[in-house]
Amino acid sequence: MIQFPESSRFHVIDESKIYPRFGHLTPRPVYVYLPEAAEEDHRRRFPVLYCQDGQNIWDDPHCCYGHGGWFLNQIADQLTREGKMEPIILVGIPNTHARYREYTPVKSYDDILSHPYANYLVDVVKRHVDRRFPTKKDRKHTALMGSSLGGLVALWMAHKLPETFSKVACLSGAFQVRDRQKKSFVEFVRERQQQDLRIYLDCGTIRDGHRTSRQVHEAYLSRGWCERGDVMYFEDKGGEHNERCWRERAWRALVFLFGGREARE
């Protein structure tokens, strides 16, 4: 049983309100956490961060095979109080038993669900969140985040849906995934023109694919992204592929995506 934040700012959207109409996706609830400023000024609107594996991003010390959650709600609140980032709305979209099929954006085998999942996020979840909560709806204020396969699909959606998203954080991206032609995500990046997209990448150095992550970062630089202006890469020496390490690094992603230029530098 997942332990969710005990706060009046935490909301659960019942799956019946956001029923997926695409590609036989499994229904699921969605979790929304408002910033403290939303209680102080009811007219104010806020940027939104859509997080994959959204059941794992909260302050549950026991979930995720004992590693604990990301504590993203507490981290965002603290960074906002310190003036290191603007207040944002967090949206957690849980994974399902079809996680691999929903989060794999390349056709590595039949019946992939990443395209229906992207449509579901934009046309169902985002539309409902924008109607119900005080969001800034435009692409400038809409971002994605995820880790492992969740980071991979977040990065892919940011590229494929530039009219909706302008920022993305990919922690420990599962860049080892290849399509049927053995094409990697590194090659996907090398084939792209530079976009108006701010990208945060990171990885650990212990069984976390750091060599491939370096190649992805270098590919972005080769295509015109500017270091620390458009793209940031952090390598966590001794970091592993788990929620504890993602929790420890999450603040870097939040500051890069939602902090001022001084904070990013």
Please state what every model-predicted region is.
Residues 1-265:
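Non-catalytic cap/lid and distal C-terminal segments of serine-dependent acyl enzymes
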